[in-house]
Amino acid sequence: ITVLDVSMDTNRAALDKALASNATVFYVDHHFAGDIPQHANLTAIINESPEVCTAALVNGYLKGRHLDWAVTGAFGDNLHDTARTLAKGLTITAEDLSSLEELGTYINYNGYGPAIEDLHFDPKELYLRLYAAEGPLDFVRNSPDFEKLSTGYREDMARAEALQPLHANPTSAVFLLPEEAWARRVSGVYSNDLATNN
């Protein structure tokens, strides 16, 4: 069993059950883990540092074999400094780095929403399409799915950016997003943008 990017603390009961059934579990995450069980069948790579994301942890485990995907994932987790630091190990143009940033953001964006029907792609289907690509830049350049994600993201963000705060002061603002699919999709990336830009 491979578990990526979900809190061990929140999912501890399921983890304990899997280990009790003698499953082998590979667990990589950057969220609060609580007490990590000591078990021969558990390999846990956990780092709760705010500058670390699961993609960077997996990249370390894989010794940089898929660094381009790690950079993409770090951008998707809104860790731009981490992504740029990782990207120093790549030989790519500034334009390509920008493409990895966009793709990471779009992958993250496609994961928000309480129902798969709200999303542009079922995350499993998107994963399979990404996996079929030779790498993230191949996906950006050659997959029509990239354009679908890009268009959806831009349209949803334009709606979000048109919202006026219910309340604002010099240190905070409160926004109410409508109960619509676009708002559910954009909630995470819009929050990231607000945090990054303010």
PLM feature spans:
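Long, charge-rich alpha-helical interaction segments
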Residues: 103-148
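Short, functional N-terminal and low-complexity linear motifs
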Residues: 22-29, 126, 156-162
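Gly/His-enriched, cation/cofactor- and phosphate-binding structural elements
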Residues: 129-198
